[in-house]
């Protein structure tokens, strides 16, 4: 997200924002306040989590992240499968510091 802001976009809507909207907003807010250092710190905090949830676990990961933060994610529709217990535990551990 921060790369896009550096290149001049006015905002961003990453898929991970569905799972952790506050954490994503904090990156944007720090950037808009002119605090690039804080924006980088906030981005670094969620980078690995976002990559795992979006790229490795996909839609099922995003939906489970939503459920963790008190939103309705629900089960993915077929042909996508729900996460395994191990995958859910991985997301819970990664998102521990990003819960709303």
Model-derived regions: residue spans:
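Catalytic alpha/beta core domains of metabolic enzymes, predominantly
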Residues: 1-54
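Short coil/turn linker and secondary-structure boundary residues
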Residues: 34, 57, 83-86
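Short alpha-helix boundary/capping motifs
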Residues: 31-33, 67, 90-94
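Flexible C-terminal active-site loop/helix
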Residues: 72-100
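Conserved short secondary-structure transition element at the edge of the structured enzyme core
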Residues: 5-9, 45-80
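A general structural signal for well-ordered alpha-helical segments in protein cores
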Residues: 1, 21-24, 59-65, 88
